[in-house]
Amino acid sequence: MPLRLPLFPLGMVLFPGLVLPLHVFEDRYRQMVRELLALPEDERRFGVIAIRQGREVGADGVQALYEVGCVAHLRRADEHEDGRFDVLTTGTTRFALRELDAGGPYLVGSVDVLPDRLGNEDEAPLLDAAVRVAFRTYLGALARASREPVPLPELPDDPLVLGYLVAATTALDLDERQRLLAQPDGTSRLRSELALLRRETTLLTRLRAAPAPELARGPVSPN
């Protein structure tokens, strides 16, 4: 049965297991946070979904959304004297957006929660091992190209979690991250990541120039 979720459109992709701090200053999202805080702690959920077209801020900013997002659990909210909030959230599970209700102060979506499947269990261990090697190689190339140390995050044992971590921390554009989020299973995600990591490593090796590493657990959105 579809689930109704308040939505927080952002210019980024949130993945399950990743931490996302947010600075909430728009009135509509302040209201959303207050309504979430009135709920029992385990029900304080909203949907983070990437903006396909438009911008984060303003009543008419969002023009189109991607179809797959991530449920965020509100873990902490600190309110400022002027009513702004600094909140800390964690991605929990993916969802597919089915219907959009724009009649209230903020968007509400009718969503289907997407299960986390490993996929091909015979192929998964091989891809898991290959992605670990490719990710470490990529980080080494990034460090050499940027001439700055790049810390290696602790890699989880679970291949599903590994796939989300690699997707969130590799320097990819929004469309590529979104495609990784929307992959049907963990094996498909790892397979795509292996190709992307090899591509990015080759580019870094050739160009000796790199974007800033995105190894923090989550960016702060100005929303």
Please tell me what each predicted stretch does.
Residues 1-223:
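N-terminal low-complexity, acidic/polar interaction/targeting segments
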